Amino acid sequence: MSLKLKIGLWIFRVIPLAVRRAVFSGLAWLGYRLSVKHRLIVLHNLTRAFPEKSPAEIVRIAKASYRSFGRVVAEFSEITRLNPDNVHQWVRIQGLEHYDEARRKGKGVLLFSAHFGNWEIGNAAMAIARKPLIFIYRILDSQFLEEAITYVRATCGNISLDKENAMRPMIRALKKGETINILIDQNVAVYDGIFVDFFGRPACTTSGLALLALHSGAPVLPVFTTRMPDGKYLMEIGAEVAIRKTGNRAADVRESTQVFTGIIEEHIRKYPEQWFWMHQRWKTKKCQAREK
């Protein structure tokens, strides 16, 4: 661990959590006010996703989404303090029976989720409750943030795996019975994904999860870590999602990816304030794609 990271984590730890939450919520509010570009992205995304909502409600959700992300940042260093004795103070887990049943199949487990609630604390809670997992992610541009995030995740035993060229390592991991968690709610380039419906609009989505499930036979489960009114989190592990297997690989991948995306949309609709609306989810357009 670099000296800069040691100092940074020490500063985070000595500042009371309540103060951190207040500070980062304030910074999030400033971000909403000062960054016109990102504010317009959020408001546009929300207006298209919820045409039935009033402008005032759209603005309320937008501001709450910023605050939610601020809390994720403020709470991140708390992961280093989580252990079997105190994790229940942060997270209550529902659906572990689905996960245990999936593990008993002996083909590894594929979890999928979104940048929703506090996915990082959810990953840590899963590692403590059962076993560490492999988290697929994109390496950050900032070397300091990259080191910090990788270190904090590893304190619970979780492994961060760069999504670039990750297919073979993931297949090997599943053969060893490992658990892999993939967030599939981000826009991808046209050559990296397929278009499926998301909030009524075509969204270019990674096909990697469906391809991996078809190749490995590993069970696929949704998981969401939602912030509750009391400030704690509810981690919900869903039942295994059936994978379409007709022999037409392209159609099977598209249909399964649509099912996964539909599950994510359904959960976001329940708690729209907790999703990352700042992201340009619909950036890639169908006109950029050649007919396949």
Spell out what each predicted region is:
Residues 1-113, 146-149, 157:
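Membrane-anchoring hydrophobic helices of lipid-metabolizing enzymes
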Residues 34, 53-56, 60-63, 103, ...:
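Non-catalytic C-terminal accessory region of glycerolipid acyltransferases
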Residues 37, 93, 117, 143-144, ...:
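Residue-level recognition of alpha-helix initiation/capping sites
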Residues 103-164, 187-194:
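Catalytic core of membrane glycerolipid acyltransferases/transacylases, capturing the structured
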Residues 99-100, 123, 149-150, 171, ...:
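Short amphipathic alpha-helical segments and helix-helix/interface helices
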